[in-house]
Amino acid sequence: MGLQARFLGLLALVIAGKCTHSPEPDQRWMLPPGWVSLGRVDPEEELSLTFALKQQNLDRLSELVQAVSDPSSPRYGKYLTLEDVAELVQPSPLTLRTVQKWLLAAGARDCHSVTTQDFLTCWLSVRQAELLLPGAEFHRYVGGPAKTHIIRSPHPYQLPQALAPHVDLVAGLHRFPPLSSPRQRPEPQGVGPVGLHLGVTPSVLRQRYNLTARDVGSGTTNNSQACAQFLEQYFHNSDLTEFMRLFGSSFAHQASVARVVGKQGRGRAGIEASLDVEYLMSAGANISTWVYSSPGRHEAQEPFLQWLLLLSNESSLPHVHTVSYGDDEDSLSSVYIQRVNTEFMKAAARGLTLLFASGDTGAGCWSVSGRHKFRPSFPASSPYVTTVGGTSFKNPFLVTNEVVDYISGGGFSNVFPQPSYQEEAVAQFLKSSSHLPPSSYFNASGRAYPDVAALSDGYWVVSNMVPIPWVSGTSASTPVFGGILSLINEHRLLNGRPPLGFLNPRLYQQHGAGLFDVTHGCHESCLNEEVEGQGFCSGPGWDPVTGWGTPNFPALLKTLLNP
């Protein structure tokens, strides 16, 4: 104990000096609505922090992602194993030694790494953590629909300058879990003709996207799919059973999820969690499904980052992952965004398809130095994920053509440059659109999203054994598109092909083949005189509202089955 105290005293002298740096200088602190501070945390209370160690060979990783994802490449579909990725990106021996010695001197204990060795999660007392990270001051907060308790620091932290070449950031200090939930809209007014429907169900989706009763998993492959849920969002298997009883009688399906990764709470089911599971398992019917449920349950952990760590630590994973998480780009530090983007790159190299909801605030809006601008969302803006926008039926009571759902998120990143795979499509949109917002509102050279879309308006969901109508949001369209990609993977696996992997390079090369082009409607944005609440508008081909369009399953299967 005396030796540890001397170590801490020496450490405090070193890091209290001027030789420190701020890893995340642009990380803004703001207490989100619905969260309340409960005051300082007891100095002897223990917390868990995750240290992101500097990775190697990221340029080479990017090259390999391009090679395995481009159908014109001889390496197409020859994905890396987790061990291959680890060998490529793992930190240098010097970084590993330096960080481990630093943490040991601080009294950190029970440290756990991942297979790729680029993240280290350790337990420390609050007192030790505040000495280790000058400036940090840990408080407990409560908020969210489940009154979740989390520990965060309202002040920026510093690291010793000597650690700058070795540590990208420390997670678990600033970012609050985003509150993402689908909207429940009022029932549309009016009465449709014979043949009407009263909301989106699996049978409506299967009719619109041309899925037959035969379009289900065979049960003979190792095909699998997953959704991830955060912030105490739980599903109940009894809800899934009731949902399939009501809406799944016309197609073969699985009665329960194959695996839950993380803690599945006993509280009330969340509408978003129920929506994710029910529509992933009805669109990707009869395919083994995993649920990542609120991973990282300790108060100081970031659930989204903990999900990424799970992906970095499992050698065998589902082929398709759908996620409804999102944050405003400007609310996150550039270091954090880039580090998370690298995790998406690692997943793409391994042949995983990651689909993210584009968000439910249209183009978004915020004010910078008194000037309004659109507000892009992340991870929707990552160049290594496939982002799913939202549509509505032109006639809400009929299975008709689709138009833009005005809440569908979309736009241009202020962080990521435009990837080469989409330059031609974006240039064509900017050249041909007759309803472009003023150029000062968006970064025309940034990564543009979404890439695709699906219906996002008027879903039926069963939650806590109650059928709930008119649930809406890209939280609905994302699992639907993910399930359809899982069906295509099923055919590829049966034909001896690899799974689709990172879809975007192929998607843009095929110029929307296999998709219904959505050409009518605009999404919402800033409510000012200059744009009057209108963001971007859809048009022929790709657009930043619905991407290339919505799935026409037989045509999309034909397009993506080979090679």
Swiss-Prot record:
EC nos: 3.4.14.9
GO CC, any one term: membrane raft
A Pfam family this chain is assigned to: Peptidase_S8
UniProt protein name: Tripeptidyl-peptidase 1
Processing and modification events after translation: Activated by autocatalytic proteolytical processing upon acidification. N-glycosylation is required for processing and activity.
Cofactor(s) this protein cannot do without: Ca(2+)
Gene3D superfamilies, per database record: Peptidase S8/S53 domain
Cystine residue pairs: 111-122, 365-526, 522-537
Alphabetical keyword list: Autocatalytic cleavage, Calcium, Disulfide bond, Glycoprotein, Hydrolase, Lysosome, Metal-binding, Protease, Serine protease, Signal, Zymogen
Keyword Ribosomal protein appears in the UniProt entry: no
Binding partners and assembly: Monomer. Interacts with CLN5. Interacts with CLN3.
PANTHER family in UniProt: PROTEASE S8 TRIPEPTIDYL PEPTIDASE I CLN2 (PTHR14218), TRIPEPTIDYL-PEPTIDASE 1 (PTHR14218:SF15)
Binding annotation for Ca(2+): 517-518, 539, 541, 543
Gene from which this protein is expressed: Tpp1
